[in-house]
Amino acid sequence: MSRKRDKPYTNRHTPARISKRRRPWAPSSSEHDEIIDKPITKPPPPPALVVMGLPANCSVLELKSRFEIYGSISRIRIHKDGIGSVSYRTAESAEAAIAGSHEPSFGISIDSKKLEVVWATDPLVKWKEGVTAGEGKERTSSFSSKLLRPVMPLRKHGRSSRLASAIVNPRSDNTKGISGDGGISSPATTSEVKQRNIVTYDDIV
């Protein structure tokens, strides 16, 4: 009995082996690395939707309340002549809105007025101003630039001095060699004209 009591119990106080406590680090596979390194390409945003037939007193909040049930909206605008544009974040939401507008029983309506929803890339509505994002801005900027473009003075074109000299002295260097009746003037007549001009200025002074 004494031998059993004197026997040390080493198993109770010895710590567990490192191999049991920690698992060796396993390097990731090459396939997993390739998947992580590949850039995540986001799908391009779908084209905007054109909403036609809006009432005159329709607001942006009313238009948003009708179309946000089909998906998340990134941009919404109301243009003139009862036309608006709605841009969804996904193509599925835009297709659902178009399908909802084509339902014969319900459709999409504001103030009991049914709306027509089509893609902005539809050739039937491409000529409408402000259909796509930025198209209206480019047109208005081009129109305003044409209307507000300053008129360049004639001096920059080199015409003011010529016009003034032609009005004051019709028989100047520009019309040299041509007489008043359409014939060719001789050097003697041109010298007489110059002498007359000089005498006239001397009399004025």
Curated annotation (Swiss-Prot):
Residues 47-122 form the RRM domain. It comes from the Eukaryota. The keyword RNA-binding applies. Residues 1-42, 170-191 are annotated as: Disordered. PROSITE patterns: RRM. One of its GO terms (molecular function) is DNA-binding transcription factor activity. Keywords: RNA-binding, Transcription, Transcription regulation. It comes from Arabidopsis thaliana. Residues 30-40 have a biased composition (Basic and acidic residues). This is Uncharacterized protein At1g27050. InterPro entries: Nucleotide-bd_a/b_plait_sf, RBD_domain_sf, RRM_dom. Residues 14-24 have a biased composition (Basic residues). CDD domains: RRM_SF. SMART domains: RRM. The keyword Cell cycle does not apply.
